[in-house]
């Protein structure tokens, strides 16, 4: 993949984006270590949860990741998050922090659009009642496509002249324009292949250009729609409306403020709570647990939270946000090990120390390049030798040992 995955978080003011980021970056699995050299001011480290390979072999108690953590076979993998500021209608025209918003956006591999599904804030984040949050989803897409489309149309006559003069193919011509938005030749080729255009590039009209731009945005910026504030009484009707309009595979229901509240109580010793769980244990549930007694006010708040969120949806949904982003990016974990028999680097270090995320379709040879920076002499999996051209398959060829080539004298 060449570089670390970056997930951009967007959302209008008061959507709960900051609360969502706080919940994702305050995971108890955080150790202070992460495999990134520098973290810029508008970036943070979040933790995506996956099923760890240790659970397949009953080694949960011996799993000690170098980065993130693992608890009961659920592994937390650090991922870089980007706080994309300045989202208001008209951002593509420079309104608000529009220029910065769009410049930040181009670095992201995927987006999480945090939407206030309660309908209690308008397009600019001002308090109101009865606002339709599906409008926010539509205008974010329009802002991004307008930004890229306007830039492309402005240069189109020159693009066409150069395309004809150099006898370039459409992929190369478009890639020279889309590269500024973080595209690769493979992404640009995928855009054109998916549209099956018969018309030569030099004869494209505005409608064709719009189709190309829309498809580029769909492929380059896969977007999770995080419907936040599901704890609000007005949320249900809006969720139903959005579910009828949007691809359900992009939707995640969440209550970021509930997640932050529960984690804070857990840290303070009032409750036992694990991220992503529907269960909240208190002193009343386990008198010998050592938990602190709750005030009547806190008991009421927890009961309301359980009724509105946990019992209805199975969790606060926050942990599902990054999991959905990984799904849209087609990411799967690979576990490089020094020993495919005991999965440890040394007797005292624990098992499955390393884990990397790769795209579905990645080969063992490509993983070797990522891990070693070069080719391995041989690649060994749990079930024997693995060929360089063998595609990584979760549960079969995702635990790998790379035997190094000996340096030439």
Curated annotation (Swiss-Prot):
The keyword Nucleus applies. Residues 5-274 form the OBG-type G domain. GTP binds at residues 11-18, 83-87. Keywords: Cytoplasm, GTP-binding, Nucleotide-binding, Nucleus. GO terms for molecular function: ATP binding; ATP hydrolysis activity; GTP binding. Transmembrane segments: none annotated. GO terms for cellular component: cytoplasm; cytosol; nucleus. It is found in: Cytoplasm; Nucleus. Coiled coil: none annotated. InterPro entries: Beta-grasp_dom_sf, G_OBG, GTP-bd, P-loop_NTPase, YGR210-like_G4. Belongs to the TRAFAC class OBG-HflX-like GTPase superfamily. OBG GTPase family. This is Uncharacterized GTP-binding protein C428.15. The lineage of its organism: Eukaryota, Fungi, Dikarya, Ascomycota, Taphrinomycotina.
């Amino acid at each position: 993949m060449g570089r670390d995955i970056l997930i951009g978080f967007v959302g209008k003011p008061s959507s709960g984006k900051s609360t969502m980021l706080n919940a994702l970056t305050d995971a108890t699995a955080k150790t202070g270590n992460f495999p990134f050299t520098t973290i810029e001011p508008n970036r943070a480290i979040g933790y995506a949860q996956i099923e760890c390979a240790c659970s397949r072999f009953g080694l949960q108690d011996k799993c000690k990741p170098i980065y993130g953590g693992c608890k009961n076979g659920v592994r937390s993998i650090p991922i870089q998050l980007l706080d994309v500021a300045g989202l208001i209608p008209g951002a593509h025209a420079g309104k608000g922090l529009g220029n910065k918003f769009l410049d930040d956006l181009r670095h992201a591999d995927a987006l999480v659009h945090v939407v206030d599904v309660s309908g209690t804030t308008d397009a600019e984040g001002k308090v109101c009642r009865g606002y339709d949050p599906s409008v926010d989803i539509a205008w974010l897409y329009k802002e991004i496509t307008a930004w890229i489309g306007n830039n492309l149309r402005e240069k189109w006559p020159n693009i066409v002249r150069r395309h004809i003069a150099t006898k370039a193919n459409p992929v190369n011509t478009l890639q020279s324009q889309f590269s500024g938005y973080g595209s690769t030749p493979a992404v640009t080729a995928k855009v054109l292949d998916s549209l099956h255009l018969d018309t030569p590039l030099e004869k494209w009209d505005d409608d064709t250009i719009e189709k190309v731009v829309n498809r580029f945005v769909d492929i380059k910026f896969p977007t999770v729609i995080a419907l936040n504030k599901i704890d609000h009484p007005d949320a249900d009707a809006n969720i139903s409306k959005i579910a009828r309009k949007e691809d359900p595979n992009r939707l995640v229901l969440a209550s970021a403020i509930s997640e932050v509240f529960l984690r804070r109580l857990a840290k303070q010793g009032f409750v036992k709570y694990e991220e992503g769980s529907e269960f909240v244990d208190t002193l009343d549930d386990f008198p010998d647990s050592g938990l602190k007694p709750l005030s009547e006010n806190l008991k009421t708040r927890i009961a309301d939270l359980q009724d509105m969120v946990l019992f209805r949806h199975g969790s606060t949904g926050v942990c599902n946000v990054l999991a959905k982003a990984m799904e849209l990016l087609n990411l799967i974990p690979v576990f490089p090990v020094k020993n495919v028999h005991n999965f440890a680097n040394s007797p005292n270090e624990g098992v499955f120390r390393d884990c990397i995320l790769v795209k579905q379709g990645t080969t063992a040879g490509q993983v070797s390049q990522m891990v070693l920076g070069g080719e391995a002499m041989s690649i060994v999996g749990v079930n024997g030798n693995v060929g360089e051209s063998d595609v990584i398959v979760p549960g079969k060829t995702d635990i790998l040992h790379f035997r190094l080539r000996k340096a030439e004298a």
